[in-house]
From Swiss-Prot:
Encoding gene (name): rplF
Subunit structure: Part of the 50S ribosomal subunit.
rRNA-binding is among the record's keywords: yes
The protein's role, per its UniProt record: This protein binds to the 23S rRNA, and is important in its secondary structure. It is located near the subunit interface in the base of the L7/L12 stalk, and near the tRNA binding site of the peptidyltransferase center.
Annotated GO biological process: cytoplasmic translation
Organism domain of life: Bacteria
This protein's name: Large ribosomal subunit protein uL6
Organism the protein comes from: Leptothrix cholodnii (strain ATCC 51168 / LMG 8142 / SP-6) (Leptothrix discophora (strain SP-6))
Length: 177
């Protein structure tokens, strides 16, 4: 059995987990998340702790018990604390502005780039060169951060572009005569 799958997931106060045959629902202060339950994994809620057991001894069932445990742990963490990604804009004239559910970027193109945020995701710009993407669903927050970064990834010679705040960009040396 997967070592990750053997660990129990503690459900904190204020988080409600309901398990049907094919759907796991996690409700908390930051929203509700749904995930289909895998057919090879049995999920049980025992006194505020979730356990994940494979239904047979196949390698797929063992692997999926660990995967389901990690995904549900992220759901529980997301609806109680939430997830966030911080992006930095590096470059002359590069600016970001949050307008409700839209992110307006001026990143060196002839036109502003506008990114619409889905429901359940909050975007903030503490300064003109910082973007904070917050939400309960870890996968959606990470995917949106990657999509925003893809508009202008950091280039290797000067480091200009959009990067994660903790990302280190390796700067190349220019060609010498």
């Amino acid at each position: 059995m997967s070592r990750v799958g053997k660990m129990l997931v503690a459900v904190p106060q204020g988080v409600d987990v309901s398990i049907n045959e094919d759907l796991i629902s996690v409700k908390g202060s930051l929203g509700t998340l749904l995930r289909p339950a895998h057919r090879l994994v049995k999920v049980q809620n025992e006194a505020g702790k979730l356990s994940f057991t494979p239904l047979d001894e196949s390698a797929e069932a063992n692997a999926m018990s660990g995967t389901m445990r990690a995904l549900v742990a992220n759901m529980v963490n997301g609806v109680s604390k939430g997830f966030q990604k911080k992006l930095s804009l590096v470059g002359v004239g590069y600016r970001a502005q949050a307008q409700g559910q839209k992110l307006n970027l001026q990143i060196g193109f002839s036109h502003p780039v506008v990114k619409e945020m889905p429901e359940g995701i909050k975007v903030e710009c503490p300064t003109q060169t910082e973007i904070l993407i917050k939400g309960a669903d870890r996968q959606v927050v990470g995917q949106l951060a990657a999509e925003v970064r893809a508009f202008r990834p950091p280039e290797p010679y000067k480091g200009k572009g959009i990067r994660y705040s903790d990302e280190k960009v390796a700067i190349k040396e220019t060609k010498k005569k």
